[in-house]
Amino acid sequence: MAMGKALSVKWTREHLLIALNLYCKLPFGRFNHRNPVLIEVASKMGRTANSLVMKLCNFASLDPIHRARGVVGLKGASKQDRLVWDEFQTDTATLGLASEQLLHDIFTADDDRELDFLQRDRVRLEPVTRFAMPVGPTEVQATVRARRGQQFFRQAVLTAYDVRCCITGIAIPRLLVASHIKPWGEFPTDRLNPRNGLCLSSLHDAAFDAGLITVDDRMRVVISRELKGYLPQESLARNFLAYEGRRIRKPEKLADPDWSCLEYHRTKIFTG
């Protein structure tokens, strides 16, 4: 299909979903027409990096966290932008997966490779063995879809927390996990919802999943009696007790963790 001039390319629903996916994965400070990631994706879409940046800024103007900070974007968010944004808020599972598939397909048809944006200097195609995936009852016959959805969730959650553990501040992507607050296997509709996620180090993710730590209604770290029962241990004191009562780092986009998800974790998973 002939694209003509890049600026004349219409914003289709498919292109909007790709832009929304990028919005979830790139920090606000990287919305720049010189960003090599945006240049590469825009080229695949047949449009200019400037037009893609403008769309990302329009999505930023709809983001409640950025609105609270006074970010107003370009004040040019269209009705179509708002509809896609609102649909994403109410049906993240469907749109998250659809956007990830669209973005994947403009780069490769190889289902054994996934896109990685966390290095931020360029788009990387990584072998699937790099990506761990939670196991649930519906995944047996849908490994590609599940992996792709998990890839979206991981990159969206890590980017929302500036690729730092929200408890310790560790900023090494290989050591970070997009931890589900409500379990992956039990709540299919929240599997891809970034508000059902926390960016944690692998150690703190394991403790969170086991109910040894949680987050209270003031966003402070709570340590269980069970974990404290293993004291005294210098490593426990350094890695857990040092953060007890401290507020977790809050996300920089897409809204704070869902209160109902955190309440579920406190009442159903946390060992007390």
Model regions: which residues?
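Short, Lys/Arg-enriched anionic-surface-contact patches
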Residues: 2-22, 144
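Short helix->loop/beta-hairpin flanking segments within DNA-binding domains
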Residues: 23-33
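Short alpha-helical "recognition helix" segments of helix-turn-helix
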Residues: 37-42
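Major-groove recognition helix of helix-turn-helix-like DNA-binding domains
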Residues: 47-62
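The −1 position to Zn-ligating cysteines in a subset of zinc-ribbon hairpins
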Residues: 48, 164, 177, 200
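Short Lys/Arg-enriched helix C-cap and helix-to-coil transition segments
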Residues: 64-84
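Short, charged surface segments at domain edges that flank catalytic/cofactor-binding sites
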Residues: 125-164, 182-195
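A detector for short metal-coordination/catalytic motifs
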Residues: 152, 170-173, 182-272
